[in-house]
């Protein structure tokens, strides 16, 4: 019998001593018989050893049904795996990056907008380590399936490894909750692939399954397929073991996206852009330039024209400054500045800093997609607290001590018909048949900026779209609100531009304004003209304890 023959015993001993590979006797017998039939019985022992190993590399270990991992290892909360265990990798995925962005990159549809998330993206400090790749592997010994995580960077692993690749787990490996925590010394890649798995576990299909999307693309073959089965071919004929250098796949650094840290906000959406060289057709935005891309060129031309050194290497995106008509500010001169409004309600919002077509092409963000998630969250909060009722207030915020005749006159008509304490809702305003100018309070947030921060006739100006969960409204922020946020007026800004030592003061003011607008979710006092469909934000106010008490009284009444 072949099981007791000297050839089979020598092959089995060689596999275990050289590669730590264990195979069942029936498979080994059948493999040796097939090799001898194909090549004759005059093969040398070394040639038989080599061909048996190559056949094992191409075999699905499920067909062998030969266990090598400890029984029930996945059921233990914590254990250690010791010794040598030859296993098969069915698939792997990089869990350090969003699956959707990886999928889009594989399909050639990569976009910086795919990196925008609905969670807080903290700015990375210069001294902080860059995020590293973390692969999650699906392994099997033919009878048990187990996950393994790249606990430390492992050069032998990369995303191009073919499904069905064989590897040896060696040394002491900690296993927690059925997941092996792999370190570089724990993994030795042997190579190989399984043809049936190559089509089933392509990166495109694996990522598509993770996000619940059907993948209809043609199966992709790994870039390292040419050496999958021939890893040992160049080395087996030389000596006892293969060279690790020939078995290691080249490690490619994952492309990192720099997070705009110009706004160290605790909430809000951030766009992460791939770094690119500056040219006449492409614009370069680095970490501290998020403030600059929503400000007109003439406001920041001081720092550019005077060659002030900048860590960001910023260059302006916009070709033309946006000049606003002075008629848009007729209600602004009369508003007394609001002294402060600390951020009490930290709501995640998204600011799209698009002004012209060039920016819109680069930041082609679907506002409705983000808004749908934000509105859904707002509505859930309102339904849970039962405190967000569709009523409003007749009073301006207490932080505004007085108003002039112009703004007062614009906020008196039909006010009592729709404005009930402590604030009203956009759906109520938009549904009203009144055509008179109305001054109302809205608990709202900014959905998107409809232009850049600009100035005209000595007044600050920026337009935006706001929402409270029941509707949308295009508004313009008054000069007094923007001046309070920025910290200086337009004439004062022009003075600061002339002094190179004041550049930091100028930038800090703009950063503060953007941060406040990004984070704000509170009560806005808005003058709304339904006839012209125009609205001006007159003041901003946080949700105070007094407002909450008013809501509770309404609920009890």
UniProtKB/Swiss-Prot annotation:
Task performed by this protein: Essential component of the RMI complex, a complex that plays an important role in the processing of homologous recombination intermediates to limit DNA crossover formation in cells. Promotes TOP3A binding to double Holliday junctions (DHJ) and hence stimulates TOP3A-mediated dissolution. Required for BLM phosphorylation during mitosis. Within the BLM complex, required for BLM and TOP3A stability.
InterPro entries, alphabetized: RMI1_C, RMI1_N, RMI1_N_C_sf, RMI1_N_N_sf, RMI1_OB
GO BP term, pick one: resolution of meiotic recombination intermediates
Any one GO molecular function term: nucleotide binding
Gene responsible for this protein: rmi1
Family affiliation: Belongs to the RMI1 family.
Domain of life: Eukaryota
UniProt subcellular location: Nucleus
Name under which the protein is recorded: RecQ-mediated genome instability protein 1
One of the Pfam families matching this protein, by short name: RMI1_C
Residue ranges, compositional bias (Low complexity): 398-413
Disordered, as annotated region: 259-284, 310-329, 382-413
């Amino acid at each position: 019998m072949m099981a007791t023959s000297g050839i089979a015993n020598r092959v089995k001993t060689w596999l275990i001593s050289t590669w730590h590979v264990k195979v069942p006797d029936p498979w080994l017998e059948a493999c040796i018989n097939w090799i001898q039939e194909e090549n004759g019985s005059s093969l040398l022992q070394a040639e038989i050893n080599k061909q048996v190993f190559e056949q094992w590399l191409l075999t699905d270990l499920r067909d062998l049904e030969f266990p090598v991992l400890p029984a029930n290892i996945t059921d233990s909360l914590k254990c250690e795996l010791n010794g040598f265990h030859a296993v098969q990798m069915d698939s792997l995925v990089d869990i350090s990056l969003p699956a959707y962005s990886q999928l889009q990159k594989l399909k050639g549809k990569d976009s910086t907008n795919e990196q925008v998330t609905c969670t807080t993206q903290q700015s990375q400090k210069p001294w902080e380590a860059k995020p590293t790749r973390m692969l999650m592997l699906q392994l099997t010994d033919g009878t048990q399936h187990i996950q393994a995580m790249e606990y430390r960077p492992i050069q032998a692993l990369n995303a191009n490894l073919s499904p069905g690749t064989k590897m040896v787990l060696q040394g002491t490996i900690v296993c927690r909750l059925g997941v092996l925590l792999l370190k570089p010394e724990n993994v030795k890649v042997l190579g190989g692939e399984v043809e049936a798995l190559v089509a089933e576990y392509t990166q495109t299909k694996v990522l598509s399954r993770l996000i619940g999307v059907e993948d209809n693309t043609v199966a992709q073959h790994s870039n390292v397929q040419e050496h999958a089965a021939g890893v040992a071919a160049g080395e087996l004929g030389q000596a006892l073991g293969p060279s690790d250098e020939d078995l290691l796949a080249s490690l490619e650094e994952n492309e990192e996206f720099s997070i705009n840290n110009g706004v160290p906000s605790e909430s809000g959406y951030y766009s992460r852009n791939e770094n690119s060289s500056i040219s006449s057709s492409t614009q370069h935005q680095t970490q501290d330039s998020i403030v600059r891309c929503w400000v007109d060129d003439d406001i920041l031309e001081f720092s550019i024209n005077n060659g002030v050194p900048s860590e960001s290497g910023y260059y302006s995106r916009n070709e033309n400054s946006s000049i606003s008509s002075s008629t848009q500010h007729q209600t602004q001169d009369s508003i007394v500045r609001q002294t402060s409004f600390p951020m009490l309600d930290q709501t995640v919002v998204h600011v799209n800093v698009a002004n012209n077509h060039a920016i819109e092409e680069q930041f082609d963000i679907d506002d409705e997609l983000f808004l749908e998630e934000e509105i859904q969250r707002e509505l859930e909060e309102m339904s849970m607290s039962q405190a967000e009722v569709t009523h409003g207030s007749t009073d301006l915020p207490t932080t505004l001590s007085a108003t002039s005749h112009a703004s007062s006159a614009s906020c008196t008509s039909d006010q009592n018909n729709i404005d009930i304490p402590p604030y009203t809702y956009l759906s109520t305003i938009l549904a009203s048949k009144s055509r008179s100018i109305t001054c109302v309070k809205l608990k709202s947030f900014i959905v998107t900026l409809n232009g850049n921060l600009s100035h005209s006739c000595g007044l600050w100006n920026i337009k935006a779209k706001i929402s409270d969960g029941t509707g949308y409204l295009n508004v313009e922020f008054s000069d007094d609100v923007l001046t309070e946020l920025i910290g200086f007026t337009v004439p004062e800004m022009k003075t600061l531009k002339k002094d190179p030592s004041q550049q930091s003061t100028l930038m800090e003011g703009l950063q503060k304004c953007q941060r406040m607008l990004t984070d704000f979710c509170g009560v806005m006092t808005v003058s709304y003209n339904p006839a012209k469909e125009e609205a001006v934000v007159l003041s901003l106010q946080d949700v105070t304890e007094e407002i909450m008490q008013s809501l509770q009284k309404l609920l009890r009444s």
